[in-house]
Amino acid sequence: MTEKRAVILLSGGLDSATVVAMAKAEGYSCYTMSFDYGQRHRAELNAAARVARDLGVVEHKVIGLNLDGIGGSALTDSSIDVPEAPGEGIPVTYVPARNTVFLSLALGWAEVLEARDIFIGVNAVDYSGYPDCRPEFVEAFERMANLATKAGVEGQGFRIQAPLQNMSKAQIVQAGMARGVDYSLTVSCYQADDDGRACGKCDSCRLRADGFKAAGIEDPTRYF
């Protein structure tokens, strides 16, 4: 039987950890990729490594990028404050072209591994309104992937899988718990401290806390 491989974007947060567990449950050999891109919340990289070990991935790769050299986001530019109150429109925590860049590098690794599936934990229900989390973006990237690669042109094809796309945060938490995810290992906060403790005020913290509450599951998040 041919090994079924998948490359999975793993930030170290709740959503991406759930996606790794889902892919593993579907029988994939999981190869996870994280990015050190100059983000404010670098504690998520330690969380990603913990999750990768705990879920038994085949290989965990960390790619260095200099997105802070571009700036334009509260997550990569320390002069822009992370908002602690809900706002309207696309928030300043949006990182320009981030998921496009991340998926492109995951696509390259997938082609080398001869993996046909790339998983990403984007969500368009309980989310911050980022344009690169929408179903239209995922579908467009998949079309591009199959036009721009040797494997795609030769008919092997890639699938961009976003299994959380239409799930609420509560449903995501429940799905992860059912598959053995230890959420105490994860970090979601946009301004977590070096120990991975959360602020409890940013949009990501609010979405996470609301998800656990709605799911009726104790939230293991540590706060500073």
UniProtKB/Swiss-Prot annotation:
Binding site for Zn(2+): 189, 199, 202, 205
Assigned keywords, A-Z: ATP-binding, Ligase, Metal-binding, Nucleotide-binding, Queuosine biosynthesis, Zinc
SUPFAM superfamilies listed in its UniProt record: Adenine nucleotide alpha hydrolases-like
Pfam entry (one): QueC
Domain of life according to the entry: Bacteria
Positions bound to ATP: 10-20
Cofactor: Zn(2+)
Biological or metabolic pathway of the protein: Purine metabolism; 7-cyano-7-deazaguanine biosynthesis
Enzymatic class: ligase
Catalytic activity, EC: 6.3.4.20
One BP annotation, GO: queuosine biosynthetic process
GO molecular function, one term: ATP binding
Cofactor: how and how many bound: Binds 1 zinc ion per subunit.
Substrates-to-products reaction catalysed: 7-carboxy-7-deazaguanine + NH4(+) + ATP = 7-cyano-7-deazaguanine + ADP + phosphate + H2O + H(+)
HAMAP family per record: QueC
Function noted in UniProt: Catalyzes the ATP-dependent conversion of 7-carboxy-7-deazaguanine (CDG) to 7-cyano-7-deazaguanine (preQ(0)).
Similarity section: Belongs to the QueC family.
Protein known as: 7-cyano-7-deazaguanine synthase
